Regions:
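Left-handed beta-helix
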Residues: 82, 88-92, 135-483
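Conformational gate/switch positions in structured elements
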Residues: 5-6, 66, 142, 206
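Flexible, active-site-adjacent loop/turn segments at secondary-structure boundaries
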Residues: 8, 18, 98, 198
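Extended hydrophobic secondary-structure segments that form protein cores and membrane-embedded regions
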Residues: 1-3, 58-65, 191-193
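N-terminal nucleotide-binding beta1-loop-alpha1 segment
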Residues: 1-12
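Conserved core of the sugar-phosphate nucleotidyltransferase
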Residues: 14-17, 27-156
Length: 483
């Protein structure tokens, strides 16, 4: 599974990897887990595919920053060297991805593959060919894996690996009329399968984190299938593993708060992702489009990383096209009386430039964050930034204390569990995987929820008793009254 990259376009989950991004429970789903992430949602489909795959197809390659659903049963998988799954999509969407092109007379066989074709190319092909968008699920035979490894090595025997792209090099060498001539790869048999009832959700960027989650949540509008009665002020607000004291409104569009404390004295807006913020008593105003990520390091130190909602952490720091906090980075420096010489580390790539201060004191964290985002005249914030050790985005991922990050998330989740149980009428509590709920209550030492009143829906009362009994069992206590 492709994962563990730099995550330039989704900085909030770069340290742990996008594949471990926590995903909110779908409001219409049954049996999901409060602690679910992108990986746990992806794996069941891939396991089903491998169960149906012929014996010689023993390797599955998939992308780590997507969520793919199949609403219908999988078809039989042909015995080919390479089998790729695709989706029927709008041509405009296909221009941003790889595309499998098949002859209309032989739709199950790959004719050739294209990478990000133009609309004109697709229109010209549509008379004689069909096309499916590549969704990144590839099955390979041992022979195909052997050739892929061979192409990834330098010419000298037992030498180092070289850069070789699965999609733009290997993929374009496949099919009946491949775009790249390679005698060995051209001989591999290839089959293309449309994913039955397939759905594709991209989680590669900060914006897609919100847009894909909104689309998933709104897949079902039928109120009979949605157990809880909570109505959010804006459908694009997501709060999980967090404690918030602010009142959210319809103005908080595209807001994601996770593993964070947002106090009553915060002012937040729209297009914001807030991750990793420890408990605090800050007075803070975040402008629209400004995101905050606080990452724990060893020895009780924290690195402060603000960024823009659409920042990509890419490019020379002196290039006007290189953005930070939604503006040219060179302009961000100038507004604060700084020059590129004040930046630590490399200057040819923003992801490798040391711009994020490491701060121990919690109040100093607030001051430097305010100075970096909105209070340009805050002299103390500038002084802290100049005198602090500063890490690049790459260094943050390398040095993050993931144990502490996960411990903080667990602490917030414990508080969320208690709140969800108390507010069961307006929460997803009783539509979750109750065995997982019981396990979490046991591990986090949370008291079992109270017995529901007699006027609660009957199925909820049954689920309540089942859950109480299971928690008591795990705690080694009497459970017969509930069971």
């Amino acid at each position: 599974m492709h994962a563990g990259g730099q995550s330039r376009r989704l900085p909030g989950y770069a340290p742990s990897g996008k594949i471990l991004t926590p995903i909110p429970v779908f409001r219409w789903a049954r049996g999901q887990k409060l602690g679910q992430n992108l990986l746990s949602l992806q794996v069941p489909l891939y396991e089903k595919i491998m169960e149906r795959a012929p014996e010689k197809l023993r390797t599955l390659i998939a992308s780590g920053d997507v969520y793919i659903r199949a609403e219908k049963p999988l078809q039989d998988i042909p015995d080919a060297d390479v089998v790729c799954y695709g989706l029927w999509v709008d041509p405009v969407l296909a221009t941003h991805h790889g595309v499998f092109v098949s002859d209309r007379k032989q739709p199950e066989a790959l004719d050739f593959m294209l990478q990000k074709p133009s609309l004109q190319e697709l229109e010209n092909l549509s008379k004689t060919h069909l096309f499916l968008m590549d969704i990144g699920i590839w099955l390979l035979s041992d022979r195909a894996v052997e050739l892929l490894m061979k192409r990834s090595q330098k010419d000298a025997s037992y030498s180092d690996l070289k850069y070789y792209d699965l999609y733009s090099a290997f993929g374009l060498s496949l099919g009946n009329h491949p775009r790249i001539i390679d005698d060995e790869l051209n001989k591999l048999s290839v089959a293309i399968l449309p994913l039955p009832g397939g759905e594709f959700y991209n989680y590669g960027t900060s914006r897609e984190l919100l847009s894909s989650t909104v689309t998933l949540q709104n897949k079902v509008y039928d109120q009979r299938q949605i157990m809880h009665r909570k109505v959010k002020p804006n459908p694009a607000i997501f709060v999980q593993n967090a404690e918030i004291g602010v009142t959210l409104s319809s103005n908080n569009d595209n807001l994601w708060i996770e593993n964070s404390f947002v106090g009553a004295s915060w002012k937040i807006g729209s297009r914001q992702i807030i991750t990793g913020v420890p408990r605090n008593d800050w007075t803070l105003a975040l402008p629209d489009g400004v995101c905050v990520d606080i990452v724990p390091l060893a020895e009780k130190r924290w690195v402060v990383r603000p960024y823009g909602f659409d920042d990509v952490f890419k490019g020379d720091i002196q290039d006007e096209k290189t953005l930070f906090l939604g503006m040219p980075f060179i302009g961000w420096l100038a507004k604060r009386g700084l020059t590129p010489d004040d930046v630590i580390g490399r200057k040819d790539d923003l992801a490798a430039a040391g711009i994020c201060p490491v701060v121990e004191d919690i109040e100093e964290r607030r001051k430097v964050l305010c100075w970096m985002t909105s209070e340009l005249e805050l002299a103390e914030g500038k002084k802290i930034w100049l005198n602090s050790q500063r890490l690049s985005a790459d260094e943050i991922s390398a040095k993050a204390d993931l144990r502490q990050l996960y411990a903080q998330r667990e602490s917030f989740r414990k508080g969320n569990w208690e709140l969800l149980a108390r507010n069961y009428e307006k929460s997803v509590f009783y539509q979750l995987d109750l065995a997982d709920v019981a396990e979490d209550f046991h591990c986090l030492k949370i008291d079992k929820p109270d017995v529901l009143p007699s006027d609660a829906p009957q199925m909820q009362r049954i689920h309540n008793r089942m859950l109480r009994a299971e928690i008591a069992k795990l705690n080694g206590k009497d459970f017969l009254n509930d069971e």
